[in-house]
């Protein structure tokens, strides 16, 4: 085992199907007029992928283990709450967050016009820098067919 303290990197992925009648929360922002996402919490794929990447990088588990459906206190929880709790858990375990990069994958909502607001909302909730991008799958897969939304995130953590 290497005794040199190095940064650690984690990857997180989250996918949720669209669900009529639910508000749409993505990247800690509500998207009025958009169909929401199904899920135990608010279905915020960007926040969930970021949490998963951070938990993985710090060896604290994954999204399902920490905030899973067996945890009723997180039913309906916002992505911002999950990000803040993830940051708290990492800090308690001796980790500092370097940054998080998130890519939202899907046809809607269109992120471009609110990307900076989304980055700020996620960064404030996490207490660390978050960058955000978005892409489509050119009609391929569940996101291309408009069945849901996905996100992938990469996180860098260092020993505090």
From Swiss-Prot:
EC number(s) for this protein? Answer: 4.6.1.12
Keyword Lyase (UniProt): yes
Return the SUPFAM superfamilies for the record. IpsF-like
- Annotated Gene Ontology MF terms? 2-C-methyl-D-erythritol 2,4-cyclodiphosphate synthase activity; metal ion binding
Name the pathway. Isoprenoid biosynthesis; isopentenyl diphosphate biosynthesis via DXP pathway; isopentenyl diphosphate from 1-deoxy-D-xylulose 5-phosphate: step 4/6
Q: Which residues are 4-CDP-2-C-methyl-D-erythritol 2-phosphate-binding?
A: 14-16, 40-41, 62-64, 135-138, 145
Cofactor-binding details, from the entry: Binds 1 divalent metal cation per subunit.
| Chain positions of site Transition state stabilizer | 40, 136
Q: Where does a divalent metal cation bind?
A: 14, 16, 48
Essential cofactor(s): a divalent metal cation
GO terms (BP aspect) = isopentenyl diphosphate biosynthetic process, methylerythritol 4-phosphate pathway; terpenoid biosynthetic process
Catalytic activity, per the record? 4-CDP-2-C-methyl-D-erythritol 2-phosphate = 2-C-methyl-D-erythritol 2,4-cyclic diphosphate + CMP
Key words, A-Z? Isoprene biosynthesis, Lyase, Metal-binding
Q: Which family does it belong to?
A: Belongs to the IspF family.
Q: How does it assemble?
A: Homotrimer.
The record's NCBIfam families line, in alphabetical order, gives: ispF
What is the role of this chain? Answer: Involved in the biosynthesis of isopentenyl diphosphate (IPP) and dimethylallyl diphosphate (DMAPP), two major building blocks of isoprenoid compounds. Catalyzes the conversion of 4-diphosphocytidyl-2-C-methyl-D-erythritol 2-phosphate (CDP-ME2P) to 2-C-methyl-D-erythritol 2,4-cyclodiphosphate (ME-CPP) with a corresponding release of cytidine 5-monophosphate (CMP).
Q: What is this protein called?
A: 2-C-methyl-D-erythritol 2,4-cyclodiphosphate synthase
Q: What is the lineage of its organism?
A: Bacteria, Bacillati, Actinomycetota, Actinomycetes, Frankiales
């Amino acid at each position: 085992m290497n005794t040199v303290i190095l940064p650690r990197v984690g990857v997180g992925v989250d996918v949720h199907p669209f669900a009529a009648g639910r508000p749409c929360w993505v990247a800690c922002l509500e998207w009025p007029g958009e169909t929401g996402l199904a899920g135990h919490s608010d279905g915020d794929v960007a926040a969930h992928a970021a949490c998963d990447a951070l938990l993985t990088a710090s060896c604290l588990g994954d999204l399902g283990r920490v905030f899973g459906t067996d945890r009723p206190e997180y039913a309906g929880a916002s992505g911002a709450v999950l990000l803040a709790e993830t940051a708290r858990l990492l800090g308690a375990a001796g980790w500092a967050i370097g940054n998080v990069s998130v890519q939202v994958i899907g046809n809607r909502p269109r992120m471009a016009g609110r990307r900076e607001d989304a980055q700020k909302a996620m960064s404030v909730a996490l207490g660390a820098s978050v960058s955000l991008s978005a892409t489509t799958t050119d009609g391929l897969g569940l996101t291309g067919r408009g069945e849901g939304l996905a996100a992938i995130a990469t996180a860098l953590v260092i020993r505090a």
